[in-house]
């Protein structure tokens, strides 16, 4: 069973226990709306019930196709940007390579990066592509897919199309193109915004190809769904309440801080989830990320003594991820006081010291998980999606649209001569 808890440390006298509890109570109405799922957002709530896109029949379909691919594949190139790759990439980077390597493409317009991609592919024997796009007008995955199709045609000849799986919206131009070309197809859920697709084929299929336990992910998400939908003693409500209280007090930036470097990509997923969902109508917190202990040497001074615009949310892993004990080489280097200590212990002391110092300036929100595995990631994905929905209702914005992101795209397409 997965474990997740929420608490806060505050030695800045910002929160009083009574004030926080009163605000949580005020927000119960928002919780109840999110627990039910609002009718006006029905066309966006395909993620709200985990079984809708991660039920038994769907899991069998993902696993069956993944098993077919795994018989020959040594490398899966996942083409996608933003919500089309962030969740899968978060799990892959955190838990490490399993059986099949995943290479991520279609997330940059850098010629240098594209050349490096093809140099890397020259080292691989049997390559498959999973192109993921809800709206196939997005430039990065579109041109990457074309470039990689050309590469596969040269490498495999007439049978190149058997190496391509697409996850597209059904009955669109791109879906029909895929069927005409003989590509294998999976549906991109039409009723889920891209950043909420962590428990759908968008994320689960490539992870299944790579050898991850997607049933454990589903199990963790289902447990979290049951917990959040059936309790008012609710960590998602507590987190949403705390962060919106801080926003209302004048804070403008939420910094998600971790002491485990392999969670870097999860931070990127979180940043898109909250940035696109909450940042509209002149409202919302700017989501940023910090990777400790390294970033303590760049951001620590600002957080301790700079503009009071920032607060922190810590994502903390309770059980050590790994172990490495510091030995001795007999040299007096000034570090004998930590001889024999485990790096995990030292890292945890740094975490506790950071909380102690930073919480004297602002409240530190703390989300604690027991360990890093597929079940925990399923739980985390659902928790943050649910909490984000609550936060957006409290803030007074529609969580599921992102019209603002089209502004730069429209200018870019015009400059490139798109008709």
Predicted regions and their residues:
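Glycine-rich phosphate-binding loops that contact phosphosugars or nucleotide phosphates
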Residues: 67-229, 410, 414
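Generic C-terminus detector
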Residues: 378-419
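Active-site phosphate/pyrophosphate-binding segments
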Residues: 156-312, 402-419
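Helicase-primase coupling helices
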Residues: 288-373
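A short, well-structured juxtamembrane/interface segment
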Residues: 53-70, 234-247
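Extended, charge-enriched "interface" segments that sit outside catalytic cores
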Residues: 1-67, 329-337
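Flexible loop/turn segments at secondary-structure boundaries
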Residues: 84-87, 111-113, 137-139, 172-175, ...
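Short helix-loop-beta junction
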Residues: 91-101, 151-154, 273-284, 357-361
